[in-house]
Structures are given as C-alpha cells and as structure tokens.
A protein has these predicted regions:
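Peripheral interaction segments used for macromolecular assembly
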Residues: 2-14, 22-137
C-alpha cells in the first residue's frame, strides 16, 4: 500500500502552527510574570520581605526538598498589605508545559550552597505535584 505524504502536509503544517502558538502563549505568560516580578522587586529595593531576604534574593532562589532535590524556581512573590512576603509562585522543576504553583513562605528555610541562596522545604515533588495550578492573570 502506497501512502501519499502530500495529503498529510496541510495537517502537519497545522499541527506545527498549533504547537508554535502554544509555545508563544507560554512564552508570553512567562514574560508577563517575569516583568511584574522584576518591577515589584525594584520597588521593594533592599528591604527584606521574608526570611531576612529581599524580594530580588527570593526571585533568584530555587526551592529544594529536604534531600536537596530541586522542586522549582521562584518566579514571583506575593506580599501582604505591609509588604511582607506570604507565598511564592514557583515554576515546577522539569514541567512541560510549564506549570506554576503557589507555596507558602511558612515552613521554608534559607539554605546557602556556594554563592547561591536557596530555600529548603519539607515538601516533596509529590506534594508539589498535588498542589493546584496557580491562577496567573
């Protein structure tokens, strides 16, 4: 049986365009989160917002499980009316497509690895996986 590949060309092109559109939308969401986080960090300046860290330091941190496994990267900081951080928006490690969840500041501890300042949690990747997706506006 001979298959005419040309018949499928429009379908393959459509699929490729759909994938591209999904990637573009993901990139736009990520860019928007990053821009808002950077603006907020700039406004906070050198003022510690949680755990003795500035907002910029929190944004540079990775979230680690107790065993050192990377759980995700901090993408944004949610603050209360007084400017204190209450939770972190993280991009879950190795998620595809990118998945974002919010975790509370309570229960996190500062961990220094070389020149890196990260945050340790008692949560596991299974715990992170069971959290609801964060609502991103």
């Amino acid at each position: 049986m001979e298959i005419n590949v040309n018949k499928f060309a429009p379908l393959l092109l459509g699929f490729a365009l759909l994938l591209s559109a999904c990637n573009d939308q993901e990139d736009q969401v990520e860019d928007r989160i990053e821009e808002q986080a950077e603006q907020s960090a700039q406004e906070s300046g050198d003022t510690p917002v949680a755990l003795g860290l500035t907002e910029r330091q929190l944004l540079d941190a990775e979230i680690l499980a107790a065993d050192g496994t990377e759980l995700g990267d901090v993408e944004a900081v949610t603050k209360d009316a007084d400017g204190n951080a209450t939770e972190l928006l993280i991009e879950v490690e190795d998620s595809d497509p990118d998945r974002y969840v919010a975790i509370p500041i309570d229960g996190l501890t500062v961990t220094t690895r070389g020149n890196d300042t990260d945050l340790s949690s008692e949560m596991t990747m299974e715990d992170i996986g069971s959290l609801p997706d964060a609502q991103i506006l």
